[in-house]
Design a protein with these regions (language model features):
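N-terminal Rossmann-like NAD(P)+-binding subdomain of aldehyde/semialdehyde dehydrogenases
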Residues: 1-92
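Conserved small-residue-rich beta-alpha loop and adjacent elements
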Residues: 76-142
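Alpha-helix C-terminal capping segments
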Residues: 111-122, 145-147, 165-171, 189-191, ...
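Short internal beta-strands
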Residues: 122-131, 236-242, 249, 320
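Conserved NAD(P)+-binding/catalytic subdomain of aldehyde/semialdehyde dehydrogenases
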Residues: 148-219, 223-226, 230-235
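A glycine- and small/hydrophobic-rich beta-loop-beta segment
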Residues: 230, 238-314
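C-terminal core of ALDH-fold dehydrogenases
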Residues: 291-399
Length: 399
């Protein structure tokens, strides 16, 4: 993987096209690497109108939610003439990676592009691998166009990450790279971190349901399986104060497996990382919840809002029996790019702040600095930084 990045950095488009031909069996040129307006129009003709409508409805909710996250620059003028503040500036450019293959995830396109757009990022570059014919999944193109991508390129894998991080003749370097991908994409993002910013290294999907005897076992089982179907490394955990509920959920799971299309993946996922844990008290259950710090947490108990106040660690919290996890994946509005592998203890969901940088503002008048210049000089001298002290002192040499 590092070799791919090194070649992209050294050879640019030449290496990018070679790796695309090698891995995606698609020959690209400078004239065909970027998705055209005609290709976007053609994508709309291939996508059902019902899906386009749903994408637009979801987009409204996602945009509305992220608009509430925006923060303005602020300034604080003090009586002595001092002005302190914080200037908010959107990143100039962002790269969004979208997986290709047989599966299309337009929801992921929306979740990664919308917060960048709301933040004010002017250049949003999406990359996604093409098929052998040099085409991109139509639903992916429709979602990208609706969300506001400014450039779309037909490249994927570690080579696409390298192009975004270092730039090539066809693709300009960006300031930050976001979006999910396979292990090679994840490792490539990790390798270029520091040269550009990245969102996170996402792990397998996780769900934890905290439930008591008021929960509907039919619903709980369905929600656990909604994440177990992602892949064999996904985790699905029920923490409950009711032994009876745990037994009923197990029965419901066995019934669902007989009719779900991805039953084989689900069975392996549950075998690897599926658990039903019984706690004696709700407080004990909450200790487990906070220790695991799941990507998705559902609270299905009596007084769920009260229980929610005791949760310290979770990526997204779904409250009540009708707030099923897929609601957050597709439609509610909060971002579905969430911390995994216990990182919800210190990381947050993807949000507008991820696409903004903050600059501190400091202004002192002569009188304001004069009042405290001796204090600064004392500090600097104590640290042995005489040039620091001199930088302040020279302004008052004649006084």
């Amino acid at each position: 993987m590092q070799g791919i990045l090194d070649e992209i950095k050294e050879k640019g488009d030449e290496a990018l096209f070679a790796y695309t031909e090698k891995f995606d069996k698609c020959k690209l040129t400078k004239d065909t690497i970027q998705v055209t307006e005609e290709e976007i129009k053609a994508a709309y003709e291939k996508v059902d109108d019902s899906l386009v409508e749903v994408i637009r409805k979801s987009l409204v909710n996602i945009r509305e939610y992220h608009e509430k996250q925006k923060r303005n620059s602020w300034f604080d003028a003090k009586p002595d003439g001092t002005i302190l503040g914080q200037k908010m500036t959107a990143l100039a450019s962002v790269g969004v990676y979208v997986p290709g293959g047989k599966a299309a995830y337009p929801s992921s396109v929306l979740m990664n592009i919308v917060p960048a757009k709301v933040a004010g990022v002017e250049k949003i570059v999406m990359v996604t691998p093409p098929n052998k014919e040099g085409e991109v999944t139509p639903a992916t193109l429709v979602a990208a166009n609706e969300a506001g991508a400014t450039h779309i390129y037909k490249v994927g894998g570690a080579q696409a990450i390298g192009a975004l991080a270092y730039g090539t003749e066809s693709i300009e370097k960006v300031d930050k790279i976001v979006g999910p991908g396979n292990i090679y994409v994840a490792l490539a993002k990790k390798a270029v971190y520091g040269h550009v910013s990245i969102d996170s290294i996402a792990g397998p999907s996780e769900i934890l349901v905290l439930a008591d005897d008021t929960a509907n076992p039919h619903f709980v089982a369905a929600d656990l399986l909604s994440q177990a179907e992602h892949d064999e490394l996904a985790s699905a955990i029920l923490v409950t104060t009711s032994k009876t509920l745990g037994e009923k959920v197990q029965e419901e799971i066995e019934g669902y497996l007989k009719k779900l299309s991805r039953a084989e993946i689900i069975e392996k996922s549950l075998e690897n990382f599926g658990y039903i844990l019984e706690a004696e008290t709700l407080n004990e259950a909450l200790e487990v919840v906070n220790a695991i710090a799941s990507e998705h947490l559902e609270i299905v108990t009596a007084n769920p809002f009260e229980v929610m106040t005791k949760v310290r660690n979770a990526g997204a919290i779904f409250i009540g029996e009708y707030s099923s996890e897929p609601l957050g994946d597709y439609f509610a509005g909060p971002n579905h790019v969430l911390p995994t592998n216990g990182t919800a203890k210190f990381f947050s969901p993807l949000n507008v702040d991820d696409f903004v940088k903050k600059s501190s503002i400091i202004y002192y008048s002569k009188d304001a600095l004069k009042a405290i210049h001796k204090d600064i000089e004392t500090f600097a001298q104590a640290e042995g930084l005489t040039a620091h002290a001199n930088s302040i002192a020279v302004r008052f040499e004649e006084e």
